């Protein structure tokens, strides 16, 4: 249908923010006040059996305010931004058809971007090219391939760490297949989101507050049984650190501890540091985000009222 003044786009709400910023609490409170249904936008919460280390909403919270797109994949399975976009659009359409408003809440900014702007026309994976890249990595090391990427696509090389073989391999694969860099292709936007989106970002006013919350929550997760949860995953035998699930913050560090590579104290230290780095990346995304209303997570009542006021205007 062609959009005209007679066919306005239906509303949707984004609640974005760094880890440990109170996004879930705000979303649940909004569900008490607005006709919304919640959709999770989190690349870790999709995995079953990864509850404590991902700070997944509790059973009580999920009973009070069900979240769609939680527990939809086994940790051994992959899940891409394209998968998320397809799933989210389907859930949003169902919510809208039921006369309610989709409220998308989470911190995976790449998913929000894919949903808003569509997906870039990247070539599909080529097993032969991927095998050639992995063979070179086995012979020369990923550092050599990262230097190669620096020459081909310096912008992507700045974003991709040498210790992230999946993303590094994909960036090289895209160039070898298409002759164009990942940076060039990601500038080409796909289909935009057919909704009128109210976008909100919730965060503490200072970095120190984020750091304090992260450290407190990490220790709370450990006290709640994070190590036991990780040991159960480790014992499966089919999971490893090349999988997106086990590369999630906290699980990667726990894996190193369970493998005997680092001590318990070092695991805790690295886990907290990695979570802080994640929050920093999330804040960097958000500071460059267009058309976003900022909310102070230290004033949840005001944040709730602000969202309701904007959405109801």
From Swiss-Prot:
- Please state the span of the N-terminal signal peptide per the UniProt entry: none
The entry's family comment says: Belongs to the IPP transferase family.
**Which amino acid positions bind substrate, per UniProt?**
19-24
Entry binding sites for ATP:
17-24
Q: What class of enzyme is it?
A: transferase
Known catalytic reactions: adenosine(37) in tRNA + dimethylallyl diphosphate = N(6)-dimethylallyladenosine(37) in tRNA + diphosphate
What is the protein's quaternary organization?
A: Monomer.
InterPro entries per the UniProt record, alphabetical? Dimethylallyltransferase, IPT, P-loop_NTPase
Query: Where does this protein come from, organism-wise?
Result: Serratia proteamaculans (strain 568)
- Molecular-function annotations in GO: ATP binding; tRNA dimethylallyltransferase activity
Known EC number(s)? 2.5.1.75
**Could you say which residues are annotated as the site Interaction with substrate tRNA?**
108, 130
Q: What keywords were assigned to this record? A: ATP-binding, Magnesium, Nucleotide-binding, Transferase, tRNA processing
User: Which gene carries the instructions for this protein?
Assistant: miaA
Q: What is this protein called?
A: tRNA dimethylallyltransferase
Region ranges (Interaction with substrate tRNA)? 42-45, 166-170, 247-252
Top-rank lineage group of the source organism: Bacteria
What disulfide bonds does the UniProt entry report for this chain? Answer: none
What is the purpose of this protein? Catalyzes the transfer of a dimethylallyl group onto the adenine at position 37 in tRNAs that read codons beginning with uridine, leading to the formation of N6-(dimethylallyl)adenosine (i(6)A).
Q: Which cofactor does it need?
A: Mg(2+)
